[in-house]
Amino acid sequence: SSFLVEMEQIALLFDYFEGEIPEIRQDQLLIVFASHRHGDHFSPAIFDLAENHPKIWFVLSDDIWRKRVPEEFLCRTSFLGPGEEFSFQKETGEKVPVTVKAFKSTDEGVAFLIEAEGKVLYHAGDLNNWVWEGEPEEYNCRMSEAFHSELLKIAGNHIDVAFMLLDTRQGKDFYLGMDDFM
């Protein structure tokens, strides 16, 4: 679930929860995203990154409890719910224009659409077409409808990089979300 994107002036770290992170330049703005509260998408360890990165900001799904954020980082944290948008330039005075839009997940939390440095990136989090063998057809239909409803909100954006789900637990339907997105 974790991805690191390094751009010219910023670095974006998505859903970090464990493992070694490559060295990130200290002069870059580091924006750390957590799409939801599940342990494979969010870890309090993200706040330890501030030791080596004075220019750090956290963008967390609003399903992550505020009390999980250390007090000293609340002023550098934005909580986003579905349909909300955050502009770093407007809200923080950062010279690098970065805009983040949040979309409702079909599981927990949000997906992110980020515009930065002339590029558009999409991180799905757990927004997926969660069709499962053994679930009632009505459930799978509702899940597909909810997924397609969110995709319609994203449609029309020229996305340069997308981080999507391929979950083999879905059996033969593992590719549906990726296929629908493409």
Short names for language-model regions:
Residues 59, 132-182:
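Cap/insert and terminal regions of metallo-dependent hydrolase folds
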Residues 5, 36, 100, 126, ...:
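Divalent metal-coordination and catalytic microenvironments
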Residues 1-24, 110-132:
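Conserved beta-strand hairpin/beta-sheet module of binuclear metal-dependent hydrolase folds
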Residues 18-64, 152-163:
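Active-site metal-binding motif and surrounding structural segment of the metallo-beta-lactamase
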Residues 12-18, 103, 142-146:
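Short gly/ser/thr-rich secondary-structure transition/capping motifs
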Residues 44-52, 71-72, 176-181:
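A short acidic, amphipathic alpha-helical/loop segment
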Residues 60-118:
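Metallo-beta-lactamase
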Residues 15-18, 36-37, 63-64, 105, ...:
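Active-site metal-binding loops of divalent metal-dependent hydrolases
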